A protein has these predicted regions:
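Juxtamembrane intracellular "pre-TM" segments in multi-pass secondary transporters
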Residues: 14, 40-66, 252-286
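Central cavity-lining transmembrane alpha-helices of secondary-active solute carriers
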Residues: 109-130, 322-337
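Multi-pass alpha-helical transporter architecture, strongest
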Residues: 241-249, 445-465
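A membrane-interface helix-boundary motif in multi-pass transporters
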Residues: 139-141, 222-237, 429-451
């Protein structure tokens, strides 16, 4: 469909991404518009091309790659605004409006759990299917567009739903569809981005993710009195942005490439990556799962926390945007610093460990200060921690992928660790609250332990410093 980027010569064959020289030797800083030389910095627009590890080539971080970096950040923002607005604001309010205050926690836990398991199954399937896809538009774009289109229709179904069963069915379709968009989108990083600049790339991509997740909560609160309109707006935004992303960053046609025959055993293995054969992948998955869970277990449930734990009741919705802005402030600071700093130092793991410690510390404030002030401090400090983690997360994950031929499938498995905690957070939190007799206090010490475990989980990773 298009020719390879003029700025990034096409690599002769796909190879396993490897650590760039600046991750194993003297650190090099990478700035937008700069030029670097690295053994694996060849860039190709071909959908099956990974980052080359052949002879050193100059890579200019500008032109098509810069456009890809910026537009992928916006694409993440659009999709994750749905994950911020719907399970964090719109869905809890819709459930509360149907079942009432007394049954809202348990009911939301059930709906969230069902949807989360749908997401868990959809992610690796989406990756595997996109890896096998042959089309004039490449292997990622068709599924990204189809995902946001079907997901948008499902959100309209949620807007029209007036029973819990209808909501649950529509929410399952939303989870599956948007994960079919999100999985192939995330696979673009190892497909088309040089390893040496993945930290900076991941920082911008992670910034879009966080702006979407937190901005979605802020915007979602604005639709508290008109939930169906909110669903319509977020569905339209995702559709528009993803279509523009595909148009602005086209892949070459891959219709002439061989497609392996479908194998049921191989398909079932999609859901399993051996921790014995690929321990770095296992620890990367575990760290991401725990850090996301520790963060979203409180952030994703903060509407009910504000209502019942802080005691704001009707004023809780108005406080959500305030907390979102504070969290965004912390996120902006740490994200814009963390990724480039990681590239400069040539280290990822230390940033993850620091981020996990900050996240754990943030949860202390609402525990000892069950007030609006305590929640405001939590919002800013947790934004610092999670933003720091997001700034290096994608880069770190891309370095532990076990196979050069199954980028999207493996990233689909890894994305379970991000999507599952975020969508399941209301369910986990609701189950804890119900188990302790409608008491919210245990959420915070449990979150602290989970965040700390997530931080230290990256220590055994050997392929990344």
């Amino acid at each position: 469909m298009t020719t390879p980027s003029d700025d990034f010569p096409e690599s002769p064959r796909p190879v396993q991404p490897t650590l760039p020289p600046n991750l194993s030797g003297a650190p090099d800083s990478v700035a937008l518009g700069s030029t670097l030389t690295t053994a694996d910095s060849a860039f190709s627009a071909a959908p099956t091309s990974a980052v080359s590890a052949q002879s050193p080539q100059k890579v200019r971080v500008r032109g098509k790659l810069l456009k890809l970096m910026l537009s992928m950040s916006v694409a993440n923002l659009a999709i994750f605004s749905i994950w911020g607005a719907v399970p964090g604001i719109l869905l809890p309010l819709q459930v509360e409006g149907i079942v009432g205050d007394g049954a809202k926690a348990g009911t939301l836990a059930i709906v969230a759990t069902i949807g989360a398991f749908a997401a868990m199954v959809a992610q690796p399937i989406a990756g595997m299917v996109s890896d096998r896809t042959r089309s004039r538009f490449g292997r990622r774009a068709p599924w990204m567009v189809a995902g946001v289109l079907i997901g948008g229709l499902a959100l309209l179904g949620m807007a029209a739903a007036n029973t819990i069963v209808q909501i649950a069915i529509a929410w399952v379709i939303v989870q599956i569809a948007y994960n079919f968009a999100q999985g192939p989108l995330s696979a673009i990083l190892p497909d088309r981005v040089p390893s040496a600049v993945r930290g900076t790339f991941a920082a911008l991509s992670g910034l879009g993710l966080m702006l979407g997740a937190l901005g979605g909560q802020i915007a979602g609160a604005a639709f508290a009195s008109s939930i169906p309109t909110g669903y319509l707006v977020f569905a339209g935004l995702a559709l528009l942005v993803i279509v523009l992303f595909v148009v602005l960053n086209p892949d070459k046609s891959n219709r002439g490439e061989p497609k392996p025959p479908f194998n049921l055993v191989a398909f079932l293995k999609t859901f399993w990556v051996s921790p014995v054969k690929h321990p770095d992948f296992f620890w990367g998955f575990t760290g991401r799962l725990l850090l996301f869970a520790g963060y979203f277990m409180v952030t994703g449930y903060q509407l009910y926390i504000l209502q019942d734990y802080i005691g704001l009741k009707g004023g809780a919705v108005a406080m959500v945007p305030v907390l979102g802005i504070l969290s965004l402030g912390g996120t902006l600071i740490s994200t814009l610093i963390g990724g480039p700093l990681s590239d400069k130092l040539g280290r990822r793991k230390i940033v993850v460990i620091i981020a996990g410690g900050i996240l754990a510390a943030s949860l202390v404030f609402p525990l000892v200060m069950p007030t609006v002030t305590g929640m405001m401090i939590f919002a800013f400090v947790s934004g610092l921690g999670f933003g720091a983690y997001q700034s290096v997360d994608t880069a770190l994950m891309s370095e532990v992928l076990p196979s050069k031929d199954d980028f999207a499938k493996d990233l689909g498995v890894l994305n379970i660790a991000a999507t599952l905690p975020q969508t399941l957070a209301p369910g986990i939190a609701g189950a804890i609250v119900v188990a302790f007799g409608q008491v919210y206090t245990p959420l915070f010490p449990i979150g602290i332990v989970i965040a700390l475990l997530g931080a230290v989980a990256v220590l055994p990773i050997k392929s990344v410093r």
